[in-house]
């Protein structure tokens, strides 16, 4: 059997295991969130947050976009953003906040599987969104401006329509997820078998060191930053189970990619919605760098004190 064929064969069990686990999580959590949307819980939380958003230079209506993204995903947030008349400045600030903390329930569940506490990652990502919102409001050119809803048609959806929409959207996401996870698992096996992973780690070593991350996480960092957090989960889980990366290394990586991931599709979508690409990318890289080095320095000092 050729090395290439063997890579495909050995990748199947771990790929299918991850796909099945992600499918269960995606179905259960997305259904629960859809029900919360239907009974009005998401809108109620948005209403409570509305007064806070003036501190981020955003109109009150932006709270609904943020909360929608927080519990659902970026697409949901963008759908609300398109109903608001936002300046580039406001769209950028709101986009950064959503990018830091979107799809929180699903993504923190995935990150927990790789060794990071759900509460810790949730706090870090939520705080990052609020801190960056406040900081960007202070340093970005321009000033606060109110917004108004556009003349988009707001229709009240029945439960049957919402359920059908959820089923179709979830099925599409599961198929896409399955294809990408399987492809990435096979690719990782091939890159490892032919020693290419070592070259990637070596090439990205300066970047990893700058961000405070282990060079052994280079491929995982690359996958998460380009394609997304959930898609790299299968590889990350397998690496952790095999002991290729330590719990501490995974935890630091999770802090970074929790704030900054999917920097191709998601960033382009928010750019199309009015955000400024470089502000959205660099601000989150800075925040993730600060968190990782803060925890590394804190850990070093605590070890020094115990000696």
Ranges and model annotations:
Residues 24, 28, 32, 41, ...:
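Hydrophobic faces of alpha-helical transmembrane segments in multi-pass integral membrane proteins
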Residues 38, 82-89, 143, 274-276:
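Helix-coil boundary and interhelical linker segments in multi-pass alpha-helical membrane proteins
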Residues 45-50, 54-61, 100-101:
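Membrane-anchoring/interfacial helices and their immediately flanking loops
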Residues 101-157, 265, 270-304:
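Transmembrane helix-loop-helix hairpins in multi-pass inner-membrane proteins
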């Amino acid at each position: 059997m050729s090395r290439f064929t063997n890579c495909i064969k050995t990748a199947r069990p771990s790929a299918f295991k991850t796909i099945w686990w992600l499918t269960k999580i995606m179905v259960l959590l997305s259904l629960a969130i859809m029900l919360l949307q239907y009974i009005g819980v998401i809108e109620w939380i948005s209403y409570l947050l509305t007064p806070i958003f003036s501190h981020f230079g955003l109109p009150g209506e932006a709270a609904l976009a943020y909360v929608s993204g927080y519990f659902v995903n970026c697409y949901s947030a963008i759908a609300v953003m398109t109903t608001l008349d936002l300046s580039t400045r406001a769209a950028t600030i709101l986009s950064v906040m959503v990018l830091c903390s979107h799809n929180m329930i699903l993504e923190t569940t995935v990150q927990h599987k790789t060794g990071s506490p759900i509460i810790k990652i949730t706090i870090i990502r939520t705080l990052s969104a609020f801190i960056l919102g406040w900081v960007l409001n202070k340093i970005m050119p321009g000033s606060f401006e109110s917004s108004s809803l556009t003349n988009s048609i707001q229709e009240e959806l029945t439960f049957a329509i919402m359920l059908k929409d959820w089923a179709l959207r979830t099925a599409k996401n599961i198929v896409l997820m399955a294809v990408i996870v399987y492809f990435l698992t096979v690719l990782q096996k091939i890159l490892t078998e032919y020693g290419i992973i070592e070259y990637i780690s070596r090439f990205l070593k300066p970047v990893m060191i700058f961000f405070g991350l282990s060079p052994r996480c280079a491929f995982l960092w690359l996958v998460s930053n380009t394609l997304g957090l959930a898609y790299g989960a299968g590889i990350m889980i397998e690496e952790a189970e095999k002991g290729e990366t330590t719990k501490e290394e995974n935890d630091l990586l999770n802090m970074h990619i929790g704030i900054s991931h999917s920097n191709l599709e998601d960033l382009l979508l928010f750019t199309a919605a009015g955000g400024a690409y470089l502000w959205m990318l660099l601000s989150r890289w800075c925040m993730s760098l600060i968190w990782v080095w803060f925890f590394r320095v804190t850990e070093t000092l605590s070890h020094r004190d115990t000696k």
